[in-house]
Design a protein with these regions (language model features):
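Active-site proximal loop and beta-alpha junction motif in alpha/beta enzyme cores
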Residues: 2-6, 10-85, 89-274
């Protein structure tokens, strides 16, 4: 995680920047996880991209540079740059497909390696690396944060805890300051479910996100865990945030395929006084 000051210190020649806002993993309007996407000709200064992300005040803003289906991609929360973001990658893929409708596959290079987005009908599919999580001792203060004792606790990029049932996941209302003191990028809370295979929620206050509506990257850890526990590789997941979101997940060796719908919300231009 790289924290960048939100006050731009460099002047640029760009006077306007296109911006799209779309909801990833959405089943309808005002659902899923909204992300802003800014297609660029060349990279802006880091401080300016961070300032734009802070002004957007969405969980992530994606910026990409490139053409003809091959791009470089970066993601910024309102507070910092992150190395991987699933929903904003799905959103960026949607924007590329709208601008280059002849494409069926988009390849992004990123700090987490190559990332692919494919489209099939109204579904887009991410091809992401597995982010394994391993059993670990229960951190101090975790039970106080959860208000219960977890069935399992694992550590990877994020701290992942398994609760007894989906009702406990839905009812969780953790204190953001307490969550920020836990190890890892954020806190994944998950449980098995009845209408889908598993449910989850994701909290990352240290990245400026009290709760993420739908978190594609968290499913890079959730999918291998539940695939092993349920003994199957194709899974249906729901994230139980207020907006909610549905994800279809498939484990294929060391990669996770994560599919969902994208619903566009707005198109516009960012105007800058340079």
């Amino acid at each position: 995680m790289k924290v960048i000051t939100t006050a731009p210190t460099e002047r640029v020649m760009t006077k306007s920047i296109p911006i799209e806002q779309v909801a990833a993993f959405a089943e309808g309007p005002f659902q899923g996880n909204p992300a802003a996407v800014c297609p660029l000709q060349t990279w802006l200064p880091d401080s300016l991209m961070q300032a734009i992300a802070a002004e957007n005040n969405l969980s992530e803003t994606a910026f990409y540079v490139g053409s003809e289906g091959r791009y470089q991609l970066r993601w910024f929360t309102p507070r910092c740059e992150v190395d991987l973001c699933g929903h904003a990658t799905l959103a960026a893929g949607h924007v590329v497909f709208q601008r280059e409708p002849h494409l069926e596959t988009v390849e992004f290079s990123s700090n987490s390696g190559p990332l692919m987005v494919r489209r099939l009908g109204d579904q887009l599919t991410l091809n992401f690396p597995v982010q394994p999580a391993y059993p670990c001792p229960v951190p101090d203060r975790l039970e106080a944060v959860l208000g219960s004792t977890p069935e399992a606790c694992l550590m990877g990029v994020d701290l992942m805890v398994v609760l007894a049932d989906e009702c406990q996941v839905a009812a969780l209302a953790p204190d953001s300051a307490a969550v920020a003191e836990l190890p890892g990028r954020g806190l994944i809370v998950t449980a098995s479910a009845t209408e889908v295979d598993f449910v989850s929620r994701f909290f990352a206050p240290s990245c400026g996100i009290a709760e993420d509506p739908v978190t594609g990257s968290a499913h890079c850890s959730l999918t291998p865990y539940w695939a092993k526990r349920l003994n199957r590789s194709d899974l249906l997941a729901r994230q139980l945030s207020a907006r909610g979101g549905m994800l279809r997940c498939q484990l294929t060796e060391e990669r996770v395929l994560i599919s969902g719908r994208v619903i566009p919300y707005l198109s516009g231009v960012i105007h800058l006084d340079c």
